[in-house]
Amino acid sequence: AALALTLVLPGLAAYEMPIQTVNEGESVYLFNADIDKPILEQNADQQRYIASLTKMMTALLFLESGKDMNAEITIPASLTQEFKDIQNANGSTINLRIGETVRRIDLLYGLLVASANDAASVIASDVSDGDLTAFVARMNQRAKELGCTSTSFTCVHGLYDYGNVSSAHDL
């Protein structure tokens, strides 16, 4: 019984306690699904650079693509310049190489666990038949379908492109 009270009481206390706001310039959107309303909003619709959160949309589209996650693919030569750009930016990678064969599921793990920018590019290329621009367009379309009105993508990984933005409310 003591354990049950320990688990329940903090949750009840959260409903009773006033919620302090965060620093004035920060964004927050805290939604309580139990009561179906936001319990804290501050600059919730302000667009912010989202960096590697971009990879969540890349992962979503990969999973929705219906591709066999256990199948192996070969990393295409068309990604040579993309890989050079990623390497020059000194971001996270799993050191994929052009011509290497890799399972799709391993790309997904690299994307989500290591935040690997090279994995994001290979995934996008795989899903869009080599057209990263088309993949980015699909990312933006999917964001709109999800009701994300403050979200805009301009690259598949969020590494060096300041055009990838979203808001606390959208996220």
Task: Please provide the spans of the model-predicted regions.
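Sec-dependent N-terminal signal peptides of Gram-positive bacterial secreted proteins and lipoproteins
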Residues: A1-A14
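Active-site-adjacent loops and short helices of periplasmic peptidoglycan-processing enzymes
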Residues: A13-H169
